[in-house]
Amino acid sequence: MATDDVNEPLPAAAELPATEAEKQPHKLERKWSFWFDNQSKKGAAWGASLRKAYTFDTVEDFWGLHETIFQTSKLTANAEIHLFKAGVEPKWEDPECANGGKWTWVVTANRKEALDKGWLETLMALIGEQFDEADEICGVVASVRPQSKQDKLSLWTRTKSNEAVLMGIGKKWKEILDVTDKITFNNHDDSRRSRFTV
């Protein structure tokens, strides 16, 4: 059985009609907000320049924002980018953060590349809900500090007292970062004193 159109080329993928599912944005489990802070003014109160930049809840919005705006290599000196759950401010005083702390990874080698990679891997892990203890995580902060030559990422938690949860978060984050460096946990109410190291 032969047909007349056997040798006709198939339509290119761009010519095929998209299904309804392909047209729909890919929703995330929860909404997230990017924040920006530039602490370059001496004597300014902490948080005086902190601004919410954008809230999103789809994979497509995340990639558009990350690719055009929110990359650590685009930060100026003493600036910070934050990604926090929508409704949570990246401040110790926020009720979601007040009884928590933060895991911190200090980046000293290949700083720009390492910080960019660690930032992106952490963002994808957060919005992709890769942490078993995702409800205990508030967000992440990327800080650029050229004077001290120590850029850093800090993963903020809701708890400071549940050691099992904190160690689970710390170990998973270190696995996500794929680093041998130590990461340290500090309470928000006493961020000068290290509590855990993995």
From Swiss-Prot:
According to the redox status, the Cys-97-Cys-138 disulfide bridge may have a role in regulating protein function by affecting its ability to bind capped mRNA. Belongs to the eukaryotic initiation factor 4E family. The modification N-acetylalanine is found at residue 2. GO terms for cellular component: cytoplasm; nucleus; plastid. Residues 8-19 have a biased composition (Low complexity). It comes from Arabidopsis thaliana (Mouse-ear cress). This is Eukaryotic translation initiation factor isoform 4E. Residues 1-25 are annotated as: Disordered. Disruption phenotype: Decreased susceptibility to TuMV and TEV. The keyword Transmembrane helix does not apply. Recognizes and binds the 7-methylguanosine-containing mRNA cap during an early step in the initiation of protein synthesis and facilitates ribosome binding by inducing the unwinding of the mRNAs secondary structures. Mediates susceptibility to Turnipmosaic potyvirus (TuMV) and Tobacco etch potyvirus (TEV). EIF4F is a multi-subunit complex, the composition of which varies with external and internal environmental conditions. It is composed of at least EIF4A, EIF4E and EIF4G. EIF4E is also known to interact with other partners. In higher plants two isoforms of EIF4F have been identified, named isoform EIF4F and isoform EIF(iso)4F. Isoform EIF4F has subunits p220 and p26, whereas isoform EIF(iso)4F has subunits p82 and p28. This isoform interacts with the viral protein genome linked (VPg)-proteinase of turnip mosaic potyvirus. Interacts directly with LOX2. Interacts with BTF3. InterPro entries: TIF_eIF4e-like, TIF_eIF_4E, TIF_eIF_4E_CS. It holds the Pfam family IF4E. MRNA binds at residues 46-47, 92-93, 145-152. GO terms for biological process: negative regulation of defense response to virus; regulation of translation; response to virus. Abundant in floral organs and in young developing tissues. GO terms for molecular function: RNA 7-methylguanosine cap binding; translation initiation factor activity. SUPFAM superfamilies: eIF4e-like (SSF55418). It comes from the Eukaryota. Disulfide bonds join 97-138.
